[in-house]
Curated annotation (Swiss-Prot):
Cellular localization per UniProt: Cytoplasm
PROSITE patterns referenced in this protein's UniProt entry, alphabetically: FTSZ_1, FTSZ_2
Name recorded for this polypeptide: Cell division protein FtsZ 1
Domain of life: Archaea
Gene from which this protein is expressed: ftsZ1
UniProt source species: Archaeoglobus fulgidus (strain ATCC 49558 / DSM 4304 / JCM 9628 / NBRC 100126 / VC-16)
GO cellular component: cell division site; cytoplasm
Record-level GO BP terms: FtsZ-dependent cytokinesis; protein polymerization
Keywords on record: Cell cycle, Cell division, Cytoplasm, GTP-binding, Nucleotide-binding, Septation
Main localization, broad class: cytoplasm
Binding, GTP: G52, G53, G54, C55, N56, G139, T140, G141, E170, R174, D217
Length: 368
């Protein structure tokens, strides 16, 4: 009976606190000093979409809403930029491209970014974490994203690139440009999360390619939102910025797995789906680190969240560093989602059968 009354009191208190948060009460008497310290401790996170693909992803993120992150769109194509939804929109390389785009030439994209380098450096100044997102293979994203990532690194920010790798159907030139762009990003970003578009065809087979691009935007959005809101949003189990930095700093190439399940065995099923996700085209047993976001409805228990992590621990290297957080989403009644980002992986599909392309910083010409 004693334990029952404790549980009932805890549940009642949780309900009161929830109501106070919704009504905006309960903080009037917090001292100014505490508010000031909280403000100073706030992690400054910026998400920068570069080029057409990157700007499309920023629009999707803006529509979804990512708590605690500023969304910024960079492009050489003024018309595309005009229709992009973002907190800030910046036209780069005005003299080089006159707002007409990079013509699918990464060298032009890089030159445009170099022209606007001072503006880019001011953009990332004071940031703790910068996400750089783009579709590799085109002109602006492939050429300019490494310049943005380099500026973020020099500003001292944890720099995470989240990119798509082109469909085989897009042609050999685009894929060769993507490989060169990926190598440059690896040299200037802490971690590069790669979404291989070819694998999306297993997720949405027999659908138009345009839909596959929309799916890619959704996955990129979930990756950034999943990492960011574990830091910025109150959660069942929170992570702080130092936790994320531990796993993502110098993480190398990373891949992402997503799983969702409902019903009695939802915890185990969601993690199984995440680990078997077509996007996670690697042997996770050799991964050196992983970041996991477990999201469930109000009915999710700590035990369910922990069982997800136990399952992941059983699949990876015993010495791998795993950090995880758990969040509640009121819309996920009787459903759980697992997002896993595995760092330090090598994927032949992404980097060629012989391993990493042999390139050096700014020492390779993009294929025209």
């Amino acid at each position: 009976m004693f334990m029952k009354s404790i549980v009932e009191e805890a549940l009642a208190r949780a309900e009161r606190e929830k109501k106070e948060r919704i009504e905006g009460r309960g903080f009037e008497d917090v001292e100014d000093e505490i508010l000031q310290v909280l403000h100073e401790l706030k992690t400054v996170i910026k998400v920068i979409g570069v080029g057409g693909g990157g700007c499309n992803t920023i629009t999707r993120m803006y529509e979804e809403g990512i708590e605690g992150a500023e969304l910024i769109a960079l492009n050489t194509d003024v018309q595309h930029l005009y229709y992009t939804k973002a907190n800030r929109r910046i036209l780069i390389g005005k003299r080089r491209t006159r707002g007409l785009g990079a013509g699918s030439l990464p060298q032009v994209g890089e030159e445009a970014a170099r022209e606007s380098e001072d503006e880019i450096k001011k953009l990332v100044e004071g940031s703790d974490m910068v996400f750089v997102t783009c579709g590799l293979g085109g002109g602006t994203g492939t050429g300019a994203a490494p310049v943005v990532a380099e500026a973020a690194q020099e500003a001292g920010a944890l720099t995470i690139a989240v990119v798509t790798f082109p469909f085989s159907a897009e042609g050999a030139v685009r894929r060769a440009n993507a490989e060169a762009g990926l190598e440059r990003l690896r040299e200037v970003a802490d971690t590069v999360i790669v979404i291989p578009n070819d694998r999306l065809l297993e997720v949405v087979p027999n659908y138009p390619m345009q839909l596959a691009f929309k799916v890619a935007d959704e996955i990129l959005m979930r990756a950034v939102k999943g990492i960011t809101e574990l830091i910025t949003k109150p959660a069942l189990i929170n992570l702080d910025f130092a936790d994320v930095r531990t796993v993502m700093e110098k993480g190398g190439v990373a891949m992402i797995g997503l799983g969702e399940a409902s019903g009695e065995d939802k915890a185990a099923e969601s993690v199984r789906k995440a680990l078997k996700s077509p996007l996670l085209d690697v042997d996770v047993s050799g991964a050196k680190a992983a970041l996991v976001n477990v999201t469930g409805g109000p009915d999710m228990t700590i035990e369910e969240a922990e069982s997800v992590i136990e399952e992941i621990y059983s699949k990876v290297d015993p010495d791998a560093r795993i950090i995880w957080g758990a969040m509640i989403d009121p819309e996920l009644e009787n459903t759980m989602r697992t997002l896993i980002i595995v760092t330090g992986v090598k994927s032949p599909q992404i980097l060629g059968r012989k391993g990493y392309p042999v390139t050096r910083k700014y020492g390779i010409d993009f294929v025209r």
